[in-house]
Amino acid sequence: TDHHKNAIDYEVAGLMWLAAARPDGAGIVEVLDHGKGWLTEPELSTGHPTREAAEDFGRRLAHTHAAGASHLGAAPDGFVPDDGYIGRAPLPLPSEPISSWGEFYAQYRIEPYMDSLDADARAIMSKLVDRLASGALDHDEPALVTCPAARTHGDMWAGNLMWTPDGVVLIDPAAQGGHAEEDLAALSVFGAPFAERIRAAYNEESPLADGWEDRIGLHQLHMLIVHCWLFGGGYVDQTVAIARRWV
């Protein structure tokens, strides 16, 4: 059921946009049919996570990202520019390019959710926002990404990876132009199986910029602050602890 204006339109456009990176890209659940407020997808057979499937997925994800996007925060093709959604939280999708990744991440992926934090937590996050916006933390996309932004899933926590007998199939995207490292970092927020093997195979297929392992926490902050906005609780302490490392 569609709980948000345009949520199904956004999901359908995102699935089709990600699937357009096939056959080299990652597996994406098929859209069988959809209408106003509803979406039909096939029932996926369940397999077991394996090292081999993880490595295959890592290589394929590199090619999905390499399919690219026009700019950071770009909406998927076919979606009239509007806010998207990550879970039940709104997701700003700017229609114009932003000058740097740090400015984009600060303005559109951290700041919109800071009103959920207490004053002390907001103070730390404000320092991080300033540092991000300065460009001091900017870094390159992986080698295969030659567009201004990667074509990202946008919500790649463990539950959105379906391990089928034919390999990993992605569901429930918050698809957008983003930094590839954010998808890779999100794998570890809730412990996706073989996350290290996924990242290692990805790095072999499309070498990541130096220091990428140190930046995993930085790229998890968007997903974590969204969880602060939605749920509060222990997510705040985790978010602030990571942010302190970067201010």
Label every PLM stretch briefly.
Residues A69-T152:
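An alpha-helical support segment within catalytic cores of ATP-dependent transferases
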Residues Y10-W17, D56-H63, K127, R131, ...:
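Alpha-helical elements of Rossmann-like donor-binding domains used by nucleotide-donor carbohydrate transfer enzymes
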Residues K36, P165-G167, L221:
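Short strand-connecting beta-turns/loops that link adjacent beta-strands
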Residues T1-E103:
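ATP-binding pocket architecture of kinase catalytic cores
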Residues G217-I225:
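Hydrophobic alpha-helical segments that form the core
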Residues P94-A106, V145-R151, A158-D214, L230-G233:
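Active-site Asp-x-Gly
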Residues H227-V247:
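ATP/Mg2+ or Mg2+-diphosphate-binding catalytic cores
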Residues D2-H3, H34-W38, S45-G47, I110, ...:
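Short, solvent-exposed loop/turn segments at secondary-structure junctions
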